[in-house]
From Swiss-Prot:
Pfam entry (one): zf-Tim10_DDP
Organism: Aspergillus fumigatus (strain ATCC MYA-4609 / CBS 101355 / FGSC A1100 / Af293)
Cystine connections: C35-C59, C39-C55
Name listed for the protein in its UniProt record: Mitochondrial import inner membrane translocase subunit tim9
The keyword Transport belongs to this UniProt entry's keyword annotation: yes
Family indicated by similarity: Belongs to the small Tim family.
Organism taxonomic ancestry: Eukaryota, Fungi, Dikarya, Ascomycota, Pezizomycotina
Cell compartments where the protein resides: Mitochondrion inner membrane
Topology in membrane: Peripheral membrane protein
């Protein structure tokens, strides 16, 4: 961000913030859709039955753990690239 004016830095930060929010909302929407499609199949009541509730909890937990692990791996690879080394495991 060197070489940018203060106004340009603020604009860049604002754009990055909007992009991150959009990506978060997309991820959240996909999570809701996937877990709903996989877990909810009884539409005879207005509430979730206990089996569906448990399935959704496991689905969300699994998705969050997978996302966290992927994020860790990306950070590891990014750090290795920044140090000029090769990607881990190569």
């Amino acid at each position: 961000m060197d070489g940018l004016t203060a106004a340009e830095q603020r604009e860049l930060a604002s754009r990055m913030e909007r992009k991150q929010l959009k990506e978060f909302m997309t991820m959240y929407s996909k999570l809701v859709q996937r877990c709903f499609d996989n877990c909810v199949n009884d539409f005879t009541t207005k509430s979730l039955i206990s089996r569906e509730e448990g399935c959704i909890m496991r689905c969300v937990d699994k998705y969050m753990k997978a996302s966290s692990r992927l994020n860790e791996r990306f950070q590891e690879q990014n750090a290795a690239m920044m140090q000029g080394g090769q990607l881990p495991g190569r």
